[in-house]
């Protein structure tokens, strides 16, 4: 229900080796469930924004150079994950007129787009309740992910794939760090 970003949380943990040595190994689906709660919370923050909040000047000021992107990826991720994540992160990186055009289009389409998204996305609490109902983990600590690591995964998950998700929209807007801080 959340644009693939939930899988990126799971993939991050799997690439780090989390739960792979358990008996039985930690289920991919359990990790995706926790990632889905996280991504639905991010979506909830995004959907609370107004078109006027999409500040082109702020977004342009927040654009990182390719060297900064590479440095951040390498600082955040394990060595075996770095090269591919650098390629993915640089592929998604947007700047200049392309970024301005993307934000202006988002501003123009936002009222209609936001209503369509609200109609199909679940609130994080609803996802938690459904996971509880079926006996699946519904909190990161239930899969041995502490709160600090969970927070860090919000940033790592954006780096590891080239698919464009809500995580990347918020990076493009220059507000992803603020959104994550509000969630924690």
Residue ranges of predicted features:
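C-terminal charged capping/lid subdomain of soluble metabolic enzymes
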Residues: 49-184
């Amino acid at each position: 229900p959340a644009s693939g970003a939930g899988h990126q949380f799971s993939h991050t943990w799997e690439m780090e080796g989390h739960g792979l040595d358990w008996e039985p190994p930690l289920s991919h689906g359990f990790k995706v469930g926790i990632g889905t709660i996280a991504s639905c919370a991010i979506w909830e923050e995004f959907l609370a924004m107004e078109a006027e909040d999409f500040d082109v000047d702020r977004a342009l000021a927040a654009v990182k150079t390719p060297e900064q992107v590479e440095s951040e990826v390498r600082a955040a991720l394990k060595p075996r994950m770095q090269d591919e994540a650098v390629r993915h992160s640089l592929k998604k990186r947007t700047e200049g007129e392309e970024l301005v055009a993307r934000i202006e289009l988002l501003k123009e389409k936002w009222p209609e787009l936001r209503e369509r998204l609200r109609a199909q996305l679940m609130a994080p609490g609803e996802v938690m309740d459904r996971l509880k109902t079926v006996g699946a983990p519904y909190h990161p600590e239930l899969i041995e992910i502490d709160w600090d690591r969970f927070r860090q995964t919000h940033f790592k998950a954006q780096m590891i794939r080239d698919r464009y998700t809500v995580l990347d929209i918020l990076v493009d807007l220059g507000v992803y760090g603020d959104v994550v801080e509000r969630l924690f």
